Amino acid sequence: MASRHISVSEQSRPMLPRHAKLRFDETRQRWVILAPERVLAPDDIAVEILQLCDGARSVAAIIDTLALKYTADRAEIGADVIAMLQDLADKGFLTEAREKTP
């Protein structure tokens, strides 16, 4: 179940690895990332970003979406998004979509 290490950039297409699931926990009344023997409870902003990490969207597209939604400075949002995604990737909670080969 080892995830390959990724370096998050605007070109990355992040997604949760197969062993991790973003779910709403009714008991805790909050979103959690479930992975084997681990649970992470991201804050509301992280959940919103993670819901956009579908392996199809690039980090640049995610940043654009959030900057438009919150009418915020793209560079500031970009730095925060990349830092958060890199932290999750370093902890094994995020991977990058691979191109399908025939």
From Swiss-Prot:
Superkingdom of origin organism: Bacteria
InterPro entries: PQQD (IPR008792), PqqD_bac (IPR022479), PqqD_sf (IPR041881)
UniProt pathway: Cofactor biosynthesis; pyrroloquinoline quinone biosynthesis
Keyword Transport: no
Keyword match Transcription: no
Gene Ontology molecular function: quinone binding
Signal peptide range in chain numbering: none
GO biological process, one term: pyrroloquinoline quinone biosynthetic process
Alphabetical keyword list: PQQ biosynthesis
Family recorded in the similarity comment: Belongs to the PqqD family.
Subunit structure: Monomer. Interacts with PqqE.
Main function: Functions as a PqqA binding protein and presents PqqA to PqqE, in the pyrroloquinoline quinone (PQQ) biosynthetic pathway.
Protein name as it appears in the record: PqqA binding protein
Lineage: Bacteria, Pseudomonadati, Pseudomonadota, Alphaproteobacteria, Hyphomicrobiales
